[in-house]
Amino acid sequence: MKLRWLMWLVVFLAGCSSTPDYKNPPWNPEVPVKRAMQWMPITEKAGNAWGVSPRLVTAIIAVESGGNPTLVSKSNAVGLMQIKASTAGREVYRYMGWSGQPSSSELKNPERNISIGTAYLSILEHGVLKGIEAPETMQYALVVSYVNGAGALLRTFSSDRKAAIEKINDLSPDEFVEHVAKNHPAPQAPRYIWKVQQAMNAM
């Protein structure tokens, strides 16, 4: 009886210390990727304009909306790239020198939605995430920051942006994902990275 209890304790503790299983339940990207790829002419145009991979943009569309341009989430994220007007939308407007934020009807327009979402990815990459050296790690950081905010990601490394970037550069891409899985306050963050990568692999 005592031996059985000790064995259970070892298994329990091992489970507590392991990385969360963010790859379950399984997710099949085939249908959402097929629907997202119909917008490739727009994603290629926006990607080239902002220096962002069109494949990454298409993968985010597949994961976020499954290619549905009129989708509105419970948190009021709108359209193909599920943009929140008051956060990402407002940030892009500010960057462009415009006042206010995009309307819901603007965000339901596929071309405008993709343009704003791609611009936001570029702002993240060349702004708060600037300095991340490994391209694969930068992609993962972009994906997490797009869905949960760059601040939440960087604070898992340090309250100081420069120190956080340095710590990120000390990790391999796989170690970065493991860090996110163990430390990010949003439990869906590592799964989001995985789903976007699955979508890119399915193209």
Curated annotation (Swiss-Prot):
<dbReference type="InterPro" id="IPR023946">
    <property type="entry name" value="EmtA"/>
</dbReference>
<keyword id="KW-0732">Signal</keyword>
<dbReference type="InterPro" id="IPR008258">
    <property type="entry name" value="Transglycosylase_SLT_dom_1"/>
</dbReference>
<keyword id="KW-0472">Membrane</keyword>
<keyword id="KW-0564">Palmitate</keyword>
<dbReference type="GO" id="GO:0016998">
    <property type="term" value="P:cell wall macromolecule catabolic process"/>
</dbReference>
<comment type="similarity">
    <text>Belongs to the transglycosylase Slt family.</text>
</comment>
<feature type="lipid moiety-binding region" description="N-palmitoyl cysteine">
    <location>
        <position position="16"/>
    </location>
</feature>
<dbReference type="InterPro" id="IPR023346">
    <property type="entry name" value="Lysozyme-like_dom_sf"/>
</dbReference>
<keyword id="KW-0961">Cell wall biogenesis/degradation</keyword>
<dbReference type="GO" id="GO:0008932">
    <property type="term" value="F:lytic endotransglycosylase activity"/>
</dbReference>
<protein>
    <recommendedName>
        <fullName>Endo-type membrane-bound lytic murein transglycosylase A</fullName>
        <ecNumber>4.2.2.n2</ecNumber>
    </recommendedName>
</protein>
<dbReference type="Pfam" id="PF01464">
    <property type="entry name" value="SLT"/>
</dbReference>
<dbReference type="GO" id="GO:0071555">
    <property type="term" value="P:cell wall organization"/>
</dbReference>
<comment type="function">
    <text>Murein-degrading enzyme. May play a role in recycling of muropeptides during cell elongation and/or cell division. Preferentially cleaves at a distance of more than two disaccharide units from the ends of the glycan chain.</text>
</comment>
<keyword id="KW-0998">Cell outer membrane</keyword>
<keyword id="KW-0456">Lyase</keyword>
<keyword id="KW-0449">Lipoprotein</keyword>
<feature type="lipid moiety-binding region" description="S-diacylglycerol cysteine">
    <location>
        <position position="16"/>
    </location>
</feature>
<dbReference type="GO" id="GO:0000270">
    <property type="term" value="P:peptidoglycan metabolic process"/>
</dbReference>
<dbReference type="InterPro" id="IPR000189">
    <property type="entry name" value="Transglyc_AS"/>
</dbReference>
<feature type="signal peptide">
    <location>
        <begin position="1"/>
        <end position="15"/>
    </location>
</feature>
<dbReference type="GO" id="GO:0009279">
    <property type="term" value="C:cell outer membrane"/>
</dbReference>
